[in-house]
Amino acid sequence: MDWGALVAATLRLYQQAGKETWQKVQRSWWVGLLPLLYAPLFLLTARFVAPLGMIGGFILGLVLALCTSSYLYFLAGVVNGNRVRPQDLLESWRPYFFSVITILFFLTIVQYALALLLTPTAGAQALIALINLILLIILNPIPEIIYQGRSEGLNMLQESIEFLRDSGVEWFLPFVALAVFSFFFFPLPILMMPLQIGRLAFPALGVGGAFWASPGSLVSAVISAFLLFVLMVFRGFLFRALASGTRRQRVFRSRFS
């Protein structure tokens, strides 16, 4: 393997993904505002179902899955170059709902199993932290696999593992670099989200809580929502480029580009 050529091909791939992201974000900028619609919906639902206990948690999970499915629908349209319109909102909740709910159900089962099987000791907490870290890594490309991958159901986990085995370094490198930059120089929580989004917890729902409480909160929420949009579109293009071939194939193609 020509490592110099691989580095050059990878940098060119990042550059191309960034260029495509800039073009698509300009064309469909309004999609960046959608989290400001999902957040109140989720928070109002949480308030109403809070007294219902486990049933309330189930309902809240369904609403979370609907919001995430809708957002992925619009991301898919942007990344695939399709025309996306606000009118599509009514259709957007359905296409990826079952894929999203499958992953959320898997995570719920894992958390319940850990709570039942492990006693609350220091060693158990360390094991739980390790398992959660592994899940964070394995699930990271799941949003892109949902709307670009070839698998359904729990087979998406296998596809994610295969993708990370082949292209994990190239996938995580820009997001780790962004997180480090944010931690030391620009502490904006949303910049950490590309490393956490695989759990489908939809970070934009936290852009705010009551982001309408003050002008400053609203401005912060809008900025966070747009940054999330830009990062997710970049992830979409990066995933497509990395999933289209092996490292050797990318090096070979870069020689003719």
Each language-model region and where it sits:
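Hydrophobic alpha-helical membrane segments
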Residues: 1-257
